[in-house]
């Protein structure tokens, strides 16, 4: 969060944004007249749910945000990459090609899809031809009038 015309940035506690998003969503959904009283009741209800179910949406949201912003999946070490490449090369040599057997339904669906694509393309070509004919006729008429 930042303040306009300021270089100050405040650190918001993890999960606080999720709590505010939930409150905002409920305020917009319910449209209460007294927003502070509604917010107090909302947070009390949220606390009761958290105590009963042992599930904290703020903590869960913080974990989701952390996973989103700090994705460690792409941070592999070089030695691991080299070992993985060697393993993949040895595996590809040993693998045998697998043939998939399509059922009749799959073949029928593929044929129907191909027919639809071909029909659409033929229609496109026909429309292009009609446009060319119309433009040629319009050009001939303008030449005859001049």
Curated annotation (Swiss-Prot):
| InterPro entries noted in UniProt | cAMP_dep_PK_reg_su_I/II_a/b, DD_CABYR_SP17, IQ_motif_EF-hand-BS, Sp17
SMART domains referenced in this protein's UniProt entry, alphabetically: IQ, RIIa
Q: Which terms in the Gene Ontology molecular function aspect does this entry carry? A: calmodulin binding; heparin binding
Has keyword Lyase?
no
Q: In which tissues is it expressed?
A: Testis- and sperm-specific.
* Gene Ontology annotations for the cellular component aspect, listed alphabetically: cytoplasm; membrane; sperm fibrous sheath; sperm principal piece
Pfam families assigned: IQ, RIIa
Which GO biological process categories is it annotated with? binding of sperm to zona pellucida
Record flagged with keyword Transferase: no
Q: What are the boundaries of the region Disordered?
A: 76-109
Taxonomic superkingdom: Eukaryota
Q: Where is the IQ domain?
A: 110-139
Topology with regard to the membrane?
A: Peripheral membrane protein
Which residues fall in a compositionally biased region of kind Basic and acidic residues? 76-88
What keywords does the record list, in alphabetical order? Membrane
Q: What is the annotated localization of this protein?
A: Membrane
PTM per UniProt?
A: The N-terminus is blocked.
SUPFAM superfamilies annotated for this entry? Answer: Dimerization-anchoring domain of cAMP-dependent PK regulatory subunit
- Compositionally biased tracts (Acidic residues): 92-108
Summarize the protein's role.
Answer: Sperm surface zona pellucida binding protein. Helps to bind spermatozoa to the zona pellucida with high affinity. Might function in binding zona pellucida and carbohydrates.
Oligomer and partners: Homodimer. May interact with ROPN1.
Looking up PANTHER family in the UniProt record yields: NEUROMODULIN (PTHR10699), SPERM SURFACE PROTEIN SP17 (PTHR10699:SF16)
**Name assigned to this protein:** Sperm surface protein Sp17
Identify the species of origin.
Answer: Oryctolagus cuniculus (Rabbit)
């Amino acid at each position: 969060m930042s303040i306009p015309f300021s270089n100050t940035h405040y650190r918001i506690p993890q999960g606080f944004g999720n709590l505010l998003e939930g409150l905002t969503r409920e305020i917009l959904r319910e449209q209460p007249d007294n927003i502070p009283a509604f917010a107090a009741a909302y947070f009390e209800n949220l606390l009761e749910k958290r105590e009963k179910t042992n599930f904290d949406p703020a903590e869960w949201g913080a974990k989701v945000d952390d996973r989103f912003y700090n994705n460690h999946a792409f941070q592999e070490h070089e030695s691991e990459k080299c070992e993985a490449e060697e393993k993949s090369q040895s595996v590809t040599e040993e693998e045998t090609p697998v043939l998939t057997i399509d059922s009749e339904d799959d073949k029928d669906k593929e044929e129907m899809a191909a027919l639809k694509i071909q029909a659409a393309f033929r229609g496109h070509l026909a429309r292009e031809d009609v446009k060319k004919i119309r433009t040629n006729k319009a050009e001939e008429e303008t030449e005859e009038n001049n």
